[in-house]
């Protein structure tokens, strides 16, 4: 055996030993690893320091492709009338006769969440902040929740 063969055998042996040590370390600390993951699971899909948004691809919803916070849909308490789904684009809308739109209101927060983040694509949006209604109460409310 020449010195080059011995060198590669030593490197390969060291690499295999490191793999075994890492495996044993994971085996010994598996309980701690599970506890750490459970504690920090809420931060798993948060925006990283590097600036790239991390997406939770397990569940598809309307906010997955949006990075601007004001554009993200959210359920908020509407004064005196339950809950509404809002973003910078406006409110989720109910379409009435003659294609008139009004704010879709929900009795509970869970109903609002279920409707807003369901698999159904809802393109009915009512934006009260377009001309000529810029100063109405609905527009002021929309601006206040964003």
Swiss-Prot record:
Pfam families: Pox_A28. Residues 22-146 are virion surface. GO terms for cellular component: membrane; viral envelope; virion membrane. Contains two intramolecular disulfide bonds. They are created by the viral disulfide bond formation pathway, a poxvirus-specific pathway that operates on the cytoplasmic side of the MV membranes. Keywords: Disulfide bond, Fusion of virus membrane with host membrane, Late protein, Membrane, Phosphoprotein, Signal-anchor, Transmembrane, Transmembrane helix, Viral envelope protein, Viral penetration into host cytoplasm, Virion, Virus entry into host cell. Induction: Expressed in the late phase of the viral replicative cycle. Part of a stable entry-fusion complex (EFC) which is at least composed of proteins OPG143, OPG147, OPG155, OPG086, OPG094, OPG107, OPG104, and OPG099. Formation of the viral membrane is necessary for the assembly of the complex. Interacts directly with protein OPG107. The lineage of its organism: Viruses, Varidnaviria, Bamfordvirae, Nucleocytoviricota, Pokkesviricetes. Belongs to the orthopoxvirus OPG155 protein family. This is Envelope protein OPG155. It is found in: Virion membrane. The keyword Phosphoprotein applies. The chain crosses the membrane at residues 1-21. One of its GO terms (biological process) is membrane fusion involved in viral entry into host cell. It is a single-pass type III membrane protein. Envelope protein required for virus entry into host cell and for cell-cell fusion (syncytium formation). Its main location: virion. The keyword Disulfide bond applies. InterPro entries: Poxvirus_A28.
């Amino acid at each position: 055996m020449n010195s080059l063969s011995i060198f590669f055998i030593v490197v390969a042996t060291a690499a295999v030993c490191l793999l075994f040590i890492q495996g044993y370390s994971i085996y010994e600390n598996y309980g701690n690893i599970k506890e750490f993951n459970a504690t920090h699971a809420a931060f798993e899909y948060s925006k990283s320091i590097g600036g790239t948004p991390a997406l939770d691809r397990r569940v598809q919803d309307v906010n997955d492709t949006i990075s601007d916070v004001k554009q993200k849909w959210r359920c908020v308490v509407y004064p005196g009338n339950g809950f509404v789904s809002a973003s910078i684009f406006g409110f989720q809308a109910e379409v009435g006769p003659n294609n008139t739109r009004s704010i879709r209101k929900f009795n509970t927060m869970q109903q609002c969440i279920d409707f807003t983040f369901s698999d159904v694509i809802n393109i009915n949006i009512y934006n009260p902040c377009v001309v000529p209604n810029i100063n109405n109460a609905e527009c002021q409310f929309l601006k206040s929740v964003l």
